[in-house]
Regions:
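Bergerat-fold GHKL/Histidine-kinase-like ATPase
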Residues: 70-328
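Short basic helix-loop element that most often maps to the first helix and adjoining turn
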Residues: 12-29, 56
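Recognition helix of helix-turn-helix/homeodomain-like DNA-binding domains
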Residues: 33-49
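A detector for short, charged/polar N-terminal pre-domain segments
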Residues: 1-9
């Protein structure tokens, strides 16, 4: 037996219940923890609305029970991934912007009291200040060109640099970033692997030794910079998460730095997805970056036939990264 959800009837019942309970759309938005425009879109029957936001609205009206096991950050990440899926759904399966060989997704939440700020102030005074040039392609970069620059979706600042309809200098998966940042100190970044460049003969077959250290460090330092720009309390913390997909059958190499630690044995992953996390104190990230990254990434490297990520390697790479920022 199969069941079909009558979405229109559910929306109608939600509107009826809101009016019966004497709630305005703004009041319902506050109860559900969503924006007023989201309520308006929901009541118009917009099927493009994320499922988690629809559930928030229905739960506020007593029409469904929200899964209490999922945290606010997990909801934020789910919404972000759903948005990305919607953006790429019309693209061919092998299009680089779909990350056909896998991707890495970073997300973080700043745990602490965050002051109220307008979206315009958030973009200009916070997001722009948080971008640090540790490399030529910094995370959460804010393009200014039409078609690439950030925009607002459901009170969240969003940017998709992988839009094939826009003329871009780089069209590979590693330069097709999708990111979202909220004024509540939540962020999500999804990016393809540089190792899957179209210039290489076999995308999806190698995993670089040093690139994960640089990329994770950049995003963690961005979280600390965002917290600083938001002027959060010094007792605040950053909960940082990374998920790698498409790792199965990849071989660990020194592709980005051929002179770094030559491999005499084959180190291959039989695991496809790896999820990692670390917790850091706001204002202490830069001074502890090597130890934080070692704690975060060691379980990832172990999936490649028990490869041991050495403390000295992480210290040297993070030292170079910090030094690189001073030169750029």
């Amino acid at each position: 037996m199969s069941y079909v959800l009558n979405w229109d009837a559910l929306v109608d019942e939600a509107v009826r219940r809101r009016k019966t309970e004497g709630l305005t759309q703004v009041q319902l938005a506050a109860l559900a923890g969503v924006s007023a425009p989201t309520i308006i879109s929901f009541e118009k029957g917009d099927k493009g609305l994320s499922l988690s936001k629809a559930i928030d609205i229905l739960a506020a009206l007593g029409l469904t029970e929200k899964n209490s096991s999922q945290t606010a950050q997990e909801n934020f990440v789910s919404d972000a991934f759903e948005r990305w899926l919607k953006l790429v759904e019309a693209l061919p399966q092998d299009h680089p912007s779909r990350f056909p060989h896998g991707f890495v997704a970073y997300d973080y939440e700043i745990e602490g009291k965050i002051p109220s700020i307008t979206l315009s102030e958030f973009r200009t005074n916070i997001l722009e200040k948080a971008v640090a040039p540790f490399s030529g392609w910094p995370p959460f970069w804010l393009p200014t060109r039409d078609g690439l620059r950030p925009y607002v979706v459901d009170d969240v600042v969003e940017c998709w640099i992988g839009d094939p309809a826009t003329n871009r200098a780089f069209t590979d998966a590693a330069h097709a970033d999708f990111w979202r940042v909220s004024r509540e100190g939540r962020a999500y970044l999804q990016r393809g692997f540089q190792e899957d460049s179209e210039d290489l003969p076999k995308p999806g077959t190698i995993f670089d030794l040093t690139l994960p250290i640089w990329r994770a460090s950049e995003v963690l330092l961005h979280a600390d910079a965002l917290a600083s720009a938001l002027k959060v309390d010094s007792s605040a913390a950053i909960n940082f998460h990374v998920k790698y997909t498409g790792l199965s059958s990849r071989q660990l190499t020194n592709w980005a730095k051929p002179d770094r630690l030559p491999f005499f044995d084959t180190h291959r992953s039989r695991t496809n997805d790896v999820a990692l996390s670390v917790r850091a104190s706001v204002g202490k990230v830069r001074e502890n970056i090597a130890s934080l990254i070692l704690e975060l990434l060691q379980p990832l490297y172990e999936k490649f036939d028990f490869f041991r990520l050495s403390e000295s390697l992480v210290q040297e790479e993070t030292r170079q990264l910090i030094s690189n920022a001073r030169k750029l």
